[in-house]
Amino acid sequence: DDAAFGGEPQVARRVLADTRGGVAALAAGGLTPGARQSGPDRDLRTLLQGFGALGDDLRYAGSARAGFAEPPGLTPAQPGRRYPALPLAEIARAASWPVVTASAETWDQAGTMLQPVGGMDAIARAFARALGSTIRYQAEVVGIRRVGERARVSWRDRKQGSGHVLDADFVICTIPLPVLKDIESDFPSPVKRAIEAGALAYIPAVKVAFQANRRWWETDQEIYGGISWTSRDITQIWYPSAGLNGDKGILLGAYIWTTSIGRRFAAMSPTRRLAAAIADGERLHPGYAGLVDKGVSVAWSKIPFTGGGWVDWGDPAWRAAYPALMNGHGPVHFAGEHMSYLNSWQEGAVRSAHAVVERIVARGRSRAR
């Protein structure tokens, strides 16, 4: 963070440990004299000592939790040298630090246990293989309407330019809202307003990735997976958790989800995005420009038929707009990450699909009676 430590990068475990120690020492200062003997205060003293690695004097003077400037060795002459404690006031200057400390503790950001080999889109590719010719590619939906109790979808073959119509008992619409708002439909006004509100709430997310011809973050800095955070525009650098100790590797050189920064990066040329990401990465890893190669960027707001990374409804829209989409419009049902409280996650899309299928099955059974 440019606002703290003179802009020098810091190891997360050190800052986390010193934050806990500094906060625990402040809290311990509020204990009543003689807390060692009294019941509740004695228990609180024990809690704070364990939480913050405080000494018997209830002060924080650094901890092995923060790591070592010189790691412990084998002989009595090599006990290891701990890092000195970072001043709590200096830690507090880092504007990005609150979100960093809480990130891994939020309910949807637990430590990753499994990941699909080949990238997250491996899941979509597996569905495509299973469905085979059922999928019609290059088919652009241009209209959705009710025809009695059924639905009619109008679509255009993008390769041949020909128009087509498909009638169905039910339609599961997973089209992202920024795209859906421009498709002709006979949805009622509350549904159209909800679609428009959601379309405005999409995050213009941006990612930048680089290839590295050697895994210098492992060999030079002992980084094996994980994330570096920065107050600069790139927001994060992700280090690969696969292919450890290999020859080459792919770094995620930027992951941007702040609307203003995302729009600014989206307006850049691909070449300019790479240059901006390298300049910011240089602050974390001096010599970065010579360590990365073959960059690529994706600005989701620029991707056709997507219009953004994911929706971020926010409390007002959750209450005012989202409910209008929950029950769909007759035979038309909506599904996707935007139809869940797990926005941006594939799990949200899958759960919403399950819910829609259950509603369709229930409706089909009621018709059969």
Which positions does each model-derived feature cover?
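FAD-dinucleotide binding site
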Residues: 1-369
